[in-house]
């Protein structure tokens, strides 16, 4: 189950919507009390009501979360490492586009407008567009998840 001096992952139950606040309070407590053995505080965006701690053991985690506002306790057991890797790994979001494609912007200030792809910056998850419906050449950078392919 728990191995000494190993990095284990513990899920802390928190009030929904307060995950970032709890993570910030945990970070502050770790810094002010100079607590060793905590390696990471993870706030999973797709797992509401939980904060994950990477720590050496329960003997460090339990006193750390004691008295933290909006922290409701520990979830039973350890989280498997492969589950944590799924949570923290970056997934490519949005459609696959290439320069020259005509796309429609589906959210943001340019919602509903047609645009042509100039370049794709996959590392940033963004695409540079030339808005076709403007009176003058207008280039904007938009996240990939805010576009939908119209024509290739």
UniProtKB/Swiss-Prot annotation:
Q: In UniProt terms, what function does this protein have?
A: Stimulates transcription elongation.
At the top level, the lineage of the source is Archaea
Record key words, sorted: Transcription, Transcription regulation
Q: How does it assemble?
A: Heterodimer composed of Spt4 and Spt5. Interacts with RNA polymerase (RNAP).
**SMART domains referenced in this protein's UniProt entry, alphabetically:** KOW, NGN
The cellular component terms of Gene Ontology attached to this UniProt record, alphabetical and capped at eight, are: ribosome
Q: Which Gene Ontology terms describe the biological processes this protein takes part in?
A: regulation of DNA-templated transcription; transcription elongation-coupled chromatin remodeling
Pfam families hit by this protein: KOW (PF00467), Spt5-NGN (PF03439)
Q: Which organism is it from?
A: Saccharolobus solfataricus (strain ATCC 35092 / DSM 1617 / JCM 11322 / P2) (Sulfolobus solfataricus)
Name the UniProt record assigns to this protein: Transcription elongation factor Spt5
Which InterPro entries does the entry link to?
KOW, NGN-domain, NGN-like_dom, NGN_dom_sf, Rib_uL2_dom2, Ribosomal_uL24_CS, Spt5_arc, Translation_prot_SH3-like_sf
- KOW domain location, by residue? 99-128
Q: Kindly give the Gene3D superfamilies that the UniProt entry links to this protein.
A: 2.30.30.30, NusG, N-terminal domain
Which gene carries the instructions for this protein? Answer: spt5
């Amino acid at each position: 189950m728990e191995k000494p001096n190993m990095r284990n992952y513990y899920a802390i139950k928190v009030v929904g919507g307060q995950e970032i606040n709890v993570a910030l309070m945990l970070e502050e407590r770790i810094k002010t009390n100079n607590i060793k053995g905590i390696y990471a505080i993870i706030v999973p965006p797709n797992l509401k009501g939980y904060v994950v701690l990477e720590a050496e053991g329960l003997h460090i985690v339990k006193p750390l979360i004691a008295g933290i506002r909006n922290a409701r306790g520990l979830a039973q057991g350890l989280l498997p490492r492969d589950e944590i890797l799924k949570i923290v790994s970056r997934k490519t979001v949005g459609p696959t586009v290439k320069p020259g494609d005509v796309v429609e912007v589906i959210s943001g200030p340019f919602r509903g407008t047609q645009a042509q792809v100039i370049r794709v910056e996959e590392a940033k998850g963004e695409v540079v567009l030339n808005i076709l419906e403007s009176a003058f050449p207008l280039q904007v950078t938009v996240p990939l998840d805010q576009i939908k392919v119209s024509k290739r």
